[in-house]
Amino acid sequence: SIVQGQVYDDGPGMGVALSGGPGFGKTAVTVGFAREYERALAAQFPDAFNQTNEFIPVCYSSLLRGAGLKAQMHHILRFYGHPVSLRATGADLVDELILVMNTCKTHLLCLDQAQNLHVGDKRDDQVAACLKDIMDGAHCTLILTGIDIHETGPLAVATGGRRQTSNDRLQLARRFTVNRIQPLARGSQEWTDLLTTIETQLVLCDTKPGDLSHAMSDSIWDRSQGAIGVAFNLLRVAANTAINDGSERITRTLLRKVSPTIEHATLKRKVA
C-alpha cells in the first residue's frame, strides 16, 4: 500500500524499516517482496519493460561495511551499470542517483545491510539528509533492511536516552514505519503460512502440498528455531540436494542429511 500510494501521490517519500537480529529473515522478506512487486508490474505493463529507456522499477543494493557516503552512492549506482566520475563528491552522486532513478522510473529502492549506514552521530545526520533527498527527488519508497536499525544510524531518534536534535533525522524517522522481524512461534499460523509459501515456490517434481507446512513443520522449526532466514537457507540446501540425488522431494530423511549451519548453531545457543 505504501509503494502504490507513493506512485500516485505527490507527497513526501515514505519508507519501511525491517529491523531485527541476524538470521531472522529480513533480507528474505525484502527480496521476496521486491521480486513480487516487479513481477506484478511486468504482468500489468509488459510493454514498459521493452521500451528504449530501461524501465527498472526496483533497485536493490546491499550496502558496504565501513564505507562513507560517496562509496555507498557509487555502490548503489553500480546496480544500474551507471558510470561515475572519480572527481564526483558524495552530494554529486546523490544527485546522479536521483537522475538515474527518475530516468529508469524506479519506484522502490531497497537498501540491505542498512546498519552499515551508521557511521557516527554527526555523519548519520548527513546520511539522513541524503536519504530524504533521494526519497523526495526520486519520488520513491525506500526500504531499509538491517540489524537493529531502529536503534542506531540515521533512523535513530534517541541515543543513550537522549533525543536527537537533527531536523533531517527526525523528519526521516517520521516518514518510516518500523517492522521488527522476530522468530516465528512453533505451530503459529505465521509459521504455517511461511512454509506453505515456500512449498508453492519449490521446483521439485514430486513435492506435495503439506510436505513442509504440515508433515515437517516441527522438524524445520527445531532446526531453525523459527528464524526465517535460517529456515530459508536450510530448505534451499535441501531442495538442491533433492534435485541432485533425483528424489525431487524434501523428506525428513533428506532433511537430516543437511548439515546445520554456523548461523543455526549460534542462534540455537542464543535461544537456549
Regions found by a protein language model. Give the residues of each.
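Phosphate-binding P-loop
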Residues: 3-13, 51
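Post-Walker A helix-loop "phosphate-sensing" segment adjacent to the P-loop in P-loop NTPases
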Residues: 36-48, 82-83
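C-terminal alpha-helical "lid" subdomain
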Residues: 185-272
